[in-house]
Regions:
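A short small-residue
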Residues: 24-25, 120
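Extracytosolic low-complexity repeat regions of secreted or lipid-anchored proteins
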Residues: 85-149
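Generic alpha-helical structural element
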Residues: 7, 27-30, 34, 125, ...
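Sec-dependent bacterial lipoprotein signal peptides
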Residues: 1-16
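Bacterial signal peptide processing site
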Residues: 18-22
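N-terminal secretory signal peptides
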Residues: 26-75
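Mature extracytoplasmic domains of secretory-pathway proteins
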Residues: 49-51, 61-102
């Protein structure tokens, strides 16, 4: 295969999500009043997070995004998790306060200091998880104001 063929193959893989099918997501309804902010966030999300290429989701909805395999999954307009309380210690990554909650095979991070909450499920394969959160921070900061702003 010549150089042009390799370039076409690489572009095809990048645009096609590296050949992975769509990420199956559990349907949910975003919190009332969050759809506009979530749509704005979706517009600004990066194509690559921690070297993982963005993938389609099934169903395709504007408040969910996914990258890589295993998939990093972002859900916008979620409620704060039950683990959140007034004394919760947040993990600060690039200007966003995240509440980490351990799950099977990874960690769920919720942007608890935003007016609209975002959850990012990060599989253990992506350690350090802060790299994923740092890649998402600019889009979140642009689209979602701080909770008390």
């Amino acid at each position: 295969m010549g150089a042009a063929g390799v370039i076409v193959l690489v572009i095809t893989l990048l645009l096609g999500g590296c050949g992975f099918g769509a990420v199956q997501i559990a349907p949910y309804e975003p919190e009332p009043g969050t759809s506009g902010a979530c749509a704005a966030l979706s517009e600004g999300l990066p194509d690559v997070v921690s070297d993982a290429v963005r993938r389609d989701t099934e169903p395709a909805v504007p408040y969910v995004a996914a990258w890589g395999d295993p998939a990093v999954v972002l859900r916008c307009g979620v409620p704060l998790p039950a683990e959140y309380g007034p004394d919760s210690r947040l993990l600060e990554v690039d200007g966003i306060g995240w509440l980490p909650v351990d799950g099977e095979g990874g960690t769920f991070f919720t942007a608890a200091d935003r007016a609209v909450h975002v959850e990012v499920a990060v599989p253990d394969d992506y350690a350090p998880e802060a790299d994923v959160l740092a890649d998402l921070a600019p889009a979140i900061l642009d689209a979602l104001p701080a909770r008390n702003a």
